[in-house]
């Protein structure tokens, strides 16, 4: 298989939990790079950054995650290719499979903020932790426009809300479920 030469797209999370009212940060050891990093990974083809951030966090840490506010996007070069990593603040959600050491991640530690920043191999990751800790606690509020539906001119029904989705619209609606779940959305309000 030919090696890709285009931009690298990735997503990650500053994963937090509390212990006695103090925040702890999840840091990971990657044996191949011999470094300490935050949960992150490359997007699968056609994958949304939000879905990738959650998927990579679960895969690498064994913790399910609820995403919060977006953080700064890191941009740097890897083997002369531009890489961008989109980050979110994340908190643990009960029900993850639990951490199992593997060839990609062989150690996971939950550390106080200062110790986590000191442990990380890259200063830019420490900057993300400082940014994450500085964010207010929020509840996501997501505003969406409907996905692609049949043209109004072609629809003969009495109520526009019954206008069927196109094939693309149906695929978008299915993918939207995972996006909303990543933010732990529990209520949906709709207009006519």
Where are these regions (language model features)?
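Unchanged
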Residues: 41-132
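N-terminal strand-loop-strand
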Residues: 2-38, 141-147, 151
């Amino acid at each position: 298989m030919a090696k890709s030469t285009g931009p690298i797209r990735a997503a990650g999370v500053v994963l937090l939990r509390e212990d006695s009212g103090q925040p702890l940060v999840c840091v990971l050891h990657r044996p191949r790079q011999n470094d300490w990093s935050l949960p992150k990974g490359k997007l699968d083809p056609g994958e949304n950054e939000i879905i990738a951030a959650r998927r990579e966090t679960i895969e690498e840490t064994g913790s399910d995650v609820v995403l919060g506010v977006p953080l700064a996007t890191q941009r740097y070069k890897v083997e002369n290719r531009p890489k961008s990593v989109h980050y979110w603040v994340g908190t643990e959600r009960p029900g993850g499979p639990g951490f199992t050491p593997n060839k990609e991640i062989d150690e996971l530690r939950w550390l106080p903020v200062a110790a986590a920043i000191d442990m990380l191999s890259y200063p830019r990751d420490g900057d993300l932790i400082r940014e994450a800790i500085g964010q207010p606690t929020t509840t996501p509020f997501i505003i969406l426009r409907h996905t692609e539906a049949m043209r109004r001119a072609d629809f003969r029904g009495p109520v526009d809300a019954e206008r069927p989705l196109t094939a693309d619209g149906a695929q978008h609606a299915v993918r939207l479920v995972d996006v909303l779940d990543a933010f732990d959305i529990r209520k949906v309000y709709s207009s006519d």
